[in-house]
């Protein structure tokens, strides 16, 4: 028996030595970090670019859209897809990042983007002629390593060159799906290496002859469904009225796929025409949900102070009192463990709250850019 143990130990040493030699050769050929033991990986947790809305950040789980990943936002027409993407661009720019917008639909409204907080002078915009050109431009921008977020609007408008050159009525089966599949194979590695967030906006179509289940599907084949780390389904659920006039939409966003946090969370928020997503409206909704804001009849109260009678008055009050709304947003983030509070335990959260009260200002809810990222 003892000789067998010695042989096993010797064989184990030989295998370990062979593995170390193989790993050394791999690192020599492909660079340091090409292979490692998972326990040796000291990368920080997944960083995020804030969506600009606390309800959406809570639904996404990590405080925003993940950096270095593919995100798909889809829904019916005029449901708020581009609005959500433009708010994310505005937040990235506010944190010192560089943003790009590939406008395949040729429908970007600079005035509306500016109203949402986008720095249109600094925003990189491309209006490509073909789908190949759009994805090639996106790939080159991502590989530059200088872009923090890139939005492609929309996948349905990425028309293959063969379809543009052909005659109306010609059949081009599967061209767009092949185009997306090839592009995403190339892009995903570059996105991870550069920490760029790629948001693909997509449209809905209906499958013919579906008897059971939803007939709805998205364009561009199945590749985007697989490569996306986050998929968001966005829908209008109600019209917001001021008297007889419709002033906006109540919107529901459901995270139907999430590889960085638990999926199937839902965010509801208001989109006001000409203004975008109402930050104050979401603060009121989540404030009531967490118990920080008390609602008695139609009155909203915070720490004994009345915010207003009715949601519109309370929204207006918070809009005119930025410090109070920032304080409330910070307390909600702490309560729901969003953004900088995501990984904290309860006692750490309370300690951070105490430190913050000493400094007498709320912490930045979108601190997901390192100094290196901002440069």
UniProtKB/Swiss-Prot annotation:
Its main location: cytoplasm. It holds the Pfam family RecA. One of its GO terms (cellular component) is cytosol. GO terms for biological process: DNA recombination; DNA repair; SOS response. Keywords: ATP-binding, Cytoplasm, DNA damage, DNA recombination, DNA repair, DNA-binding, Nucleotide-binding, SOS response. One of its GO terms (molecular function) is ATP binding. InterPro entries: AAA+_ATPase (IPR003593), DNA_recomb/repair_RecA (IPR013765), DNA_recomb/repair_RecA_CS (IPR020584), P-loop_NTPase (IPR027417), RecA-like_C (IPR049261), RecA-like_N (IPR049428), RecA_ATP-bd (IPR020588), RecA_C_sf (IPR023400). HAMAP family: RecA. It is found in: Cytoplasm. Residues 348-358 have a biased composition (Acidic residues). Belongs to the RecA family. This is Protein RecA.
């Amino acid at each position: 028996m003892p000789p067998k143990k010695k042989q096993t130990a010797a064989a184990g040493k030989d295998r370990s030595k062979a593995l170390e030699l193989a790993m050394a050769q791999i690192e020599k050929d492909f660079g340091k970090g090409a292979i490692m033991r998972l326990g040796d990986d000291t990368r920080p947790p997944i960083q995020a670019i804030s969506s600009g809305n606390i309800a959406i950040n809570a639904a996404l789980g990590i405080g925003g859209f993940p950096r270095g990943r593919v995100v798909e936002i889809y829904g019916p027409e005029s449901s708020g897809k581009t609005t959500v993407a433009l708010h994310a661009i505005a937040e990235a720019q506010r944190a010192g990042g560089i943003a790009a917008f590939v406008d395949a639909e040729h429908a970007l409204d600079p005035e509306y983007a500016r109203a949402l907080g986008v720095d249109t002078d600094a925003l990189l915009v491309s209006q490509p002629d073909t789908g190949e050109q759009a994805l090639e431009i996106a790939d080159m921008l991502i590989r530059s390593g200088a872009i923090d977020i890139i939005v492609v609007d929309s996948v349905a408008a990425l028309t293959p060159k063969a379809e543009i050159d052909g005659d109306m009525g010609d059949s081009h089966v599967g061209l767009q799906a092949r185009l997306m599949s090839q592009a995403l194979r190339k892009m995903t590695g570059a996105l991870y290496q550069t920490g760029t967030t790629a948001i693909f906006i997509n449209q809905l179509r209906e499958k013919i002859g579906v008897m059971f289940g939803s007939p709805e599907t998205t364009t561009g084949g199945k590749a985007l469904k697989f490569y996306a780390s986050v998929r968001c389904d966005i829908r209008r659920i109600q019209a917001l009225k001021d008297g007889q006039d419709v002033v906006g939409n109540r919107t529901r966003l459901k995270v139907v796929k999430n590889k960085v946090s638990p999926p199937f969370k839902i965010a509801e928020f208001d989109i006001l025409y000409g203004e975008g997503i109402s930050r104050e409206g979401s603060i009121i909704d989540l404030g009531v949900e967490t118990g920080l804001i008390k609602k008695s009849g139609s009155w909203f109260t915070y720490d004994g102070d009345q915010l207003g009678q009715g949601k519109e008055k309370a929204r207006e009050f918070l809009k005119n009192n930025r410090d109070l709304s920032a304080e409330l947003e910070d307390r909600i983030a702490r309560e729901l463990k969003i953004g900088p509070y995501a990984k904290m335990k309860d006692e750490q959260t309370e300690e951070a709250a105490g430190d913050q009260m000493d400094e007498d200002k709320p912490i930045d809810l979108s601190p997901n850019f390192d100094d290196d990222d901002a440069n």
